[in-house]
């Protein structure tokens, strides 16, 4: 049985997930819609990027690789962003597994969502026509002794540099350009995201 519960902590939304009933040789079998789409190698990355959601996405990526290491996986992204460490666990797994991971932005891909969108397989990263993409530098907040604040500030700068290096690699932009363009919230339309190199094309319809 395929499982894909990205929002199990939100019971009202969970209660409204549609079910799909299929006829099999052994009778009827029902799936929630996300589990049924997982059978088609489709993963949904929606909402805030946090540890619980990231663990589920990573588990699905590893499972689909074990099922067929030679068939592409698609991740549909609609996310405002979230925790860098959670997002990096997804990103590193996308790069680690053998199947190409195609990314598709529907709605929005902001902050870490945009980073994961750009991290898809080259030539297989897409936006839907009305999607919005936003890149910026990592955010951080810490309270404590001055020496501890300094340590955390240095760590944020290291993370910022790592993210910028990876964005430069995936987009083909110069490092200086990435540093300038991520200094503040930088929103892009689907066309602008293509021109920037965050995605490879716009999907208006299948076929």
UniProtKB/Swiss-Prot annotation:
The keyword Hydrolase applies. One of its GO terms (molecular function) is ATPase binding. It is an enzyme of class 3 (hydrolase). GO terms for cellular component: cytoplasm; endopeptidase Clp complex. Its main location: cytoplasm. The active site is at residues 111, 136. Gene3D superfamilies: 2-enoyl-CoA Hydratase, Chain A, domain 1. Keywords: Cytoplasm, Hydrolase, Protease, Serine protease. One of its GO terms (biological process) is protein quality control for misfolded or incompletely synthesized proteins. Its EC number is 3.4.21.92. It catalyses: Hydrolysis of proteins to small peptides in the presence of ATP and magnesium. alpha-casein is the usual test substrate. In the absence of ATP, only oligopeptides shorter than five residues are hydrolyzed (such as succinyl-Leu-Tyr-|-NHMec, and Leu-Tyr-Leu-|-Tyr-Trp, in which cleavage of the -Tyr-|-Leu- and -Tyr-|-Trp bonds also occurs). Pfam families: CLP_protease (PF00574). The keyword Cytoplasm applies. Cleaves peptides in various proteins in a process that requires ATP hydrolysis. Has a chymotrypsin-like activity. Plays a major role in the degradation of misfolded proteins. Fourteen ClpP subunits assemble into 2 heptameric rings which stack back to back to give a disk-like structure with a central cavity, resembling the structure of eukaryotic proteasomes. HAMAP family: ClpP (MF_00444). PANTHER family: ATP-DEPENDENT CLP PROTEASE PROTEOLYTIC SUBUNIT. Belongs to the peptidase S14 family. This is ATP-dependent Clp protease proteolytic subunit. The gene is clpP.
């Amino acid at each position: 049985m395929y499982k894909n519960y990205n929002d199990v902590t939100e019971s009202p939304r969970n209660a409204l997930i549609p079910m799909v009933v299929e006829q099999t040789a052994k009778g009827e079998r029902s799936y929630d819609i996300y589990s049924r789409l997982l059978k088609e190698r489709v993963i949904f990355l929606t909402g805030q990027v946090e540890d619980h959601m990231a663990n589920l996405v990573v588990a699905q990526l590893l499972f689909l690789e074990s099922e067929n290491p030679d068939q592409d996986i698609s991740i549909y992204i609609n996310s405002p962003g979230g925790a860098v460490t959670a997002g990096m666990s997804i990103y590193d797994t996308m790069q680690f597994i053998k199947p190409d991971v195609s990314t598709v932005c529907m709605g929005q891909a902001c902050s870490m969502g945009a980073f994961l969108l750009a991290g898809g397989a080259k030539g297989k990263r897409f936006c839907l026509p009305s999607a919005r993409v936003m890149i910026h530098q990592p955010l951080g907040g810490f309270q404590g002794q001055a020496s501890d604040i300094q340590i955390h500030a240095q760590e944020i700068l290291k993370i910022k540099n790592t993210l910028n290096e990876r964005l430069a690699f995936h987009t083909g932009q110069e490092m200086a350009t990435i540093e300038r363009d991520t200094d503040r919230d930088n929103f892009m339309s689907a066309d602008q995201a293509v021109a920037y190199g965050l995605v490879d094309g716009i999907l208006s319809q299948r076929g």
